[in-house]
Amino acid sequence: AYQPLGRNAPPEVKNTQWIRNGIDNFVLARLEAAGIDPSEEADRHTLIKRLFYDLIGLPPEPEQVDPFVDDRSPDAYEKLVNRLLASPRFGERWGRHWLDKARFADSDGYEKDNPRPDAWRWRDWVIDAVNRDMPFDEFTVRQLAGDLLPEAGPIDRLATAFHRQTLTNTEGGVDQEEFRVAAVKDRVDTTGAIWLGLTVGCAQCHSHKYDQITQREYYQLFAFFNNGDEATAEVPTSDEATARYEEAKKKHDAKSA
């Protein structure tokens, strides 16, 4: 698995008219090897539904379909793609994937599962980062150590709430140190999984059987996260964002009452 990445030249294909970019070469080469012809190009009604579901996770409104179907300009498809990429819904759709991997939730978990009223602030930071097309290296640094950046501001510290997405036990009488250590372990495991793509957690009890991670290395990483404190910081947000949250919360509470 630990092989350096190489740059492979796109394979040659017979049906060169079908090719629009280098990725198509790889797809078509496999299809031709299997004796399979590519599917016919989808009609406009199918295309707009696919684009909406893929890019923003929502179906198109009826009044959005006809203008695209009737638009016969050669760049109609590209214009629709750009419009959906510029939509705030794009960040909500694709930021959801990162939020899931980072174990985001609006409540603490465990038996009490108390609500986290300010959890949405980090969620919205992720969504905004996706919508602004933040470079992945910057996206990484700000979440892992945004508070250590030169002249770090409140938003930089907010990004590090990635580390606060662990389960929190607020039940009375529990051993807080036990659950603090469990939270640190969760940070190690999650960081290894989503940034390294490795099951780092296997090395908690023994050196990894398959990946090149020793038990000693696991606890070296554990020691790094064990130095952090779960400090509470006031993070200012715009009045507009706060108003949107309060309005959405009222609607949610009314429906679930």
Which residue ranges define each predicted feature?
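Short, structured secondary-structure elements
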Residues: 1-246
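Long, charged, low-complexity terminal extensions
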Residues: 248-257
